[in-house]
Amino acid sequence: MLEVSLPENVTVVVETGGATEWQNETVDPSCLERYVYQDEELSFVDSVPSASMGEASTLADFLDFCSTNYPADHTAVIFWDHGSGSASGVSFDEIYDYDSLTLDEIYNAFASVYELSEENPPLDLVGFDACLMATVDTASMLSDVASYMVASEETEPGNGWYYTGWLGALAEDPSMDGATLGTAICDSFQEGCEIYGTDDEITLSVIDLSRISPLLVAYDNLGREALSYACADPIFFSEFGRSALQSENYGGNTEDQGYTNMVDLGDLVNNSAALFTDTGTDVLSALEDCVVYKVNGPYREKSSGLSCYYSYSGNTDDFIQYASVGASDAFRYLYSYELSGSLDEDGIAYVSEMGYGELPEIPSLAEDGSGDYPLTLNDEGYAVMELDADTANLLKGVYFQLAYMDVEDDILLYLGRDNDIDMDWENGVFTDNFRGVWGSIDGNLCYMEIVYEGDDYNLYSVPVKLNGEDYHLRVVYDYSAEEFTILGARKGIDDNGMSDRNLIQLQPGDELTTIHYASTISGDDDFTPVEIDTFTVTENTTFEETEMGDGQFLMLFEMVDLKNESVYSDPIIFTVTDGEIEAEL
């Protein structure tokens, strides 16, 4: 930013806070400070006592300060640093127990300072230089606050927006409207990420908020159609769940990484086209109309510009946090029914108006007492799991879990979870594809867990220690290139729901330690993390499949049912001797 020479009619006002320390000697973390950047000079202009950046009153006070002291014909408000989607919001304050601004708090702050109007919104643009905030719910909240919104569906890399680029464009043409400014922000962001080598998974979009109302109507109608199908037959939840698992989702969404429960709206609707015969087309049309510009990396090619909530975690507490800010009543009742099996009084009244009375019970494989599912060996020696139609219809997804067995030392070393299975959903037949190979870094076997399964690529999470700190490597397998690539290292979602925006590129000389999970074979103890191999990153460090060598390996088929609960098959033991594989049930 400080590299841009601003004209006299462009002013940038900055408020600092929320950090225990800053990467400079200028900012005092003990209070909230305000700076003004004009021409080529950054000037300190004000300070106020320390307060949480996650409080609506703190934001409102800053907005009022700007409006009073620096009135302007055109105004943009930018939120910088950590975001975590619809449920947790933005601006996590590490001084005040990581308190964050929820969507309703953001709205209340704007409403206390400005006269809000969808026909004549007070702001030209609201931007989030933060992770995961390009959601339907965020856009709904801002519909009478600003003309345009700029935000990312995915976590942003640590380099963030390229302020030199878009502020430079604004300096050259201060008359530009919000759409043009948003486009400059997107293009310069992509340029900056390409410079830093962090562009593989980027997303950034410009939303015309004057066009958001038709999308909100279409989105709620989609929820009503989904709710009607679920009330008629809860098997809908498994069918919809399969579509969600195949859709581009953001921020991790695994037990190991944590959950944001955000999925691309367009990709979800496209993957659910066979389910939503009445409303899906309207959503896609309205979505295309309001997303006026976007950029995305090669491994975020399904990004449509806005995400929505889907309960990947299956956690009721996560949902309750979201429910108060969700843009659609219908989807709120849909997920409430899916997660709890019931609806509150308002929900019952809602579905009654739709013509539904008593809700059917949601079936669950985990609760029906069916136990482990038997396997057979086919003529080629592969393990086969055959499910009847009723059982297969309850499933959202099928995976396998793999572990190494050290019988002599009574150790079971968990290697991970993948979807490399021959799946015949129509006939309920699932066949293993064990080849005696697994993912490794420079020949060091890793724990790896699939986080996205697409037509063109899969994404994996690999827990490691990077220079002594816990991280997850983001690894992609590209089907066309037939190879793995390490995209970078990022920390998971923390206990406050805050995502990590720092995607770190591995550098020669970095120290990596692989993390696996181990238990005893004979006992019923839980898996605990263990450090296995420590090695140094080189210029030639690669992730690839490698032969695991001789030994015994245990595999289970994992079935995820429509309640997001997992049930497992009987185990199969693979014994590898001199490269030859023998299976035993």
Model-inferred region functions:
Residues 51-121:
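Extracytoplasmic mature domains of secreted/periplasmic and thylakoid-lumen proteins
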Residues 90-128, 133-585:
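Terminal, contiguous helix-loop blocks that mediate binding/assembly
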Residues 2-71:
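N-terminal extension/subdomain marker
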Residues 7-12, 70-76, 119-125, 144-148:
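Loop/turn elements at helix/coil->beta-strand transitions in domains of secreted/extracellular proteins
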Residues 24, 72, 83, 550-554, ...:
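Membrane helical hairpin/interfacial module
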Residues 16-21, 83, 130-132, 154-156:
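Short beta-alpha junction loops
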